[in-house]
A protein has these predicted regions:
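N-terminal helix-turn-helix DNA-binding core of bacterial DNA-binding proteins
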Residues: 8-47
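Basic, amphipathic "hinge/linker" alpha-helix immediately C-terminal to the N-terminal HTH DNA-binding motif
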Residues: 18, 71-94
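Key DNA-contact positions within bacterial/archaeal DNA-binding proteins
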Residues: 50
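Residues within the DNA-recognition helix of helix-turn-helix
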Residues: 55
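Alpha-helical DNA-recognition elements
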Residues: 58
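Short hydrophobic beta-strand motif reused across regulatory alpha/beta modules
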Residues: 64-65
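Acidic, aliphatic-rich amphipathic alpha-helical segments
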Residues: 84-150, 200-227
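C-terminal interaction segments
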Residues: 162-227
Length: 227
C-alpha cells in the first residue's frame, strides 16, 4: 500500500482505505458481521482471490480487521472488524448518502445482492409517522428478498420473506431502491418496472434522509416522491 506522504488526516485515512475494494470489504463486514473468506468473496462479485487476500492482510496490518481461527465444526478463519474498523460506519453512511446522486442509472452488468437492498431503508430513511401502528413492507428486487419493519418510530430491516406484509414492492433494483431513497417517485418507479401491492400509503412514512438528492452533472433532478 503506497502512502500519500502528507501530514493530513484525509490523506492518512486514504492511505489505509483508499485502495480499490477496501471500503467494499468494510461494507460487507459491517453488513454481514464476522465472515469466512468465502462469504466475503461471494459478497464482492468481481474481486480476484489473491486481491481479496492482499486487501485483508492490509486491513489486518492497519488494525481495522482481525482474523480468528474458529473451532470445529466451522474450522475456518473468521474476519471481523475491530473497533477502529467499525468506526468507519458513519463515514460509509455519509459516502453512501452522497452516492445516491449517481444511482439514476442501473448498468446491465451491475451485480446486486439482498444485503445492499436491506441496508438502504435503515440508513437512508426515517419514520415520518412514529406514532402510527407497526407495519411491514416486503421488498423484492432482482429476486432478492428483504423486509422493512416500521414501529416505535424506528425503521428496521432484515433479509428474507415477511409472513403477512402490508405492502409488497417488487421490481428491478433501480426502481425499488430509487423509490425507497427518494431518487424516484412512485409513478416513475412504476415506469421502471415496479409493482406495488397493498397499502401504498405506507410509503409516505418512509421519509428520505435527503428528500431530493442533488443529481450528478448531466442528470435531471427527480420529482419528490408521492404515494
Amino acid at each position: 500500500m503506497r502512502s500519500y506522504d502528507q501530514y493530513c488526516s484525509i490523506a492518512r485515512a486514504l492511505d489505509v482505505t483508499g485502495d480499490r475494494w477496501t471500503l467494499l470489504i468494510v461494507r460487507e463486514l459491517l453488513l454481514q458481521g464476522p465472515c469466512r473468506f468465502t462469504d466475503l468473496k461471494r459478497g464482492l462479485p468481481g474481486i480476484a482471490t489473491n486481491l481479496l487476500s492482499a486487501r485483508l492482510k492490509e486491513l489486518e496490518s492497519a488494525a481495522l480487521v482481525t482474523r480468528e481461527d474458529a473451532p470445529p465444526p466451522v474450522a475456518t478463519a473468521l474476519y471481523e472488524l475491530t473497533e477502529s474498523g467499525r468506526a468507519l460506519e458513519p463515514a460509509l453512511k455519509a459516502l453512501a448518502l452522497w452516492g445516491l446522486r449517481f444511482m439514476g442509472e442501473e448498468r446491465a452488468d451491475d451485480a446486486f445482492q439482498a444485503r445492499w437492498l436491506a441496508y438502504a431503508p435503515a440508513w437512508f430513511t426515517t419514520d415520518a409517522d412514529p406514532d402510527a401502528p407497526p407495519a411491514v413492507i416486503q421488498l423484492i428486487a432482482a429476486g432478492e428478498l428483504a423486509v422493512i419493519e416500521l414501529g416505535d418510530g424506528q425503521v428496521r430491516t432484515r433479509l428474507g420473506r415477511a409472513a403477512d406484509p402490508d405492502l409488497v414492492l417488487d421490481g428491478p433494483p433501480r426502481a425499488v431502491l430509487g423509490l425507497l431513497t427518494g431518487v424516484v417517485d412512485l409513478e416513475r418507479a412504476g415506469h421502471l418496472g415496479l409493482s406495488a401491492t397493498g397499502a401504498t400509503g405506507l410509503l409516505a412514512r418512509l421519509r428520505p434522509a435527503v428528500s431530493d438528492p442533488a443529481p450528478a452533472r448531466g442528470e435531471a433532478r427527480s420529482q419528490p416522491r408521492r404515494a
